[in-house]
Amino acid sequence: MSTSEAGAAATVIPIDDVARDHGKAPAVATAPPPPAAAAAVPAAATTTAPRKTGVPFFRRADRGSRCVALLDFVLRVAAFGPALAAAIATGTSDETLSVFTQFFQFHARFDDFPALLFFMVANAIAAGYLVLSLPFSAVIVLRPQAIGLRHLLLVCDMIIAALLTAAAAAAAAIVDLAHSGNLRANWVPICMQFHGFCQRTSGAVVGSFLAVLVLLFLVILAAFAIRKR
């Protein structure tokens, strides 16, 4: 080995060995700081992100449709009461009139008149339909764009309105005959004797016609809503 090679070998000293000899820990390499542009991107994104706010139930886009659907729901509840009351009043309108003794009696029964029997059944069907249609009406309140349900309810409303109109008209004729009689046929009025029967059937006819009016308004309302959509 020459003198120059020995000098070169002597000058190579590891840094770790020197730091260990002096009692110092080796330097830890640190990552360079991120660029200013990269650090500013998340801050800008957080400042420009839109704030989440709750969407109101009656939005501006479909506020009118929701109001019409809500009115439809309320009217169905309103029509249910008169229809059910008419069916109950007719079904409980039987009356017995005793003359002289309890063995000689006259009866006034609603099922003796086919028109009144049809009237009671029609009102019971209408009341049941109005209850069953409430969930569908509630779905339309939540989803005004459900045109198929609107068409279905419109057709069913028209059928029930026609059925209830026929039943109420037939019952009204019988009630008028019970109040006034018919002189040409020698049919005497019976309401002078059977007060309870006539009062119940008369009230039932009035309630049924109220339900018919509400159903007709429902048909007009549904047609207007479908045409608007």
Swiss-Prot record:
User: Topological domains (Cytoplasmic): residue ranges?
Assistant: 1-67, 137-157, 227-229
Task: Give an example GO cellular component term for this record.
Answer: plasma membrane
Query: Does the UniProt entry include the keyword Iron-sulfur?
Result: no
Q: Where are the transmembrane segments?
A: 68-88, 116-136, 158-178, 206-226
What Pfam families does the annotation carry? CASP_dom
Topological domains, Extracellular: 89-115, 179-205
Task: Establish whether keyword Phosphoprotein is in the entry.
Answer: no
Q: What is a biological process (GO) this protein takes part in? A: cell wall organization
Its assembly, as annotated, is:
Homodimer and heterodimers.
What NCBIfam families does its record include?
A_tha_TIGR01569
Family stated for the protein in its record: Belongs to the Casparian strip membrane proteins (CASP) family.
By what name is this protein known?
A: Casparian strip membrane protein 1
Q: Which organism is it from?
A: Sorghum bicolor (Sorghum)
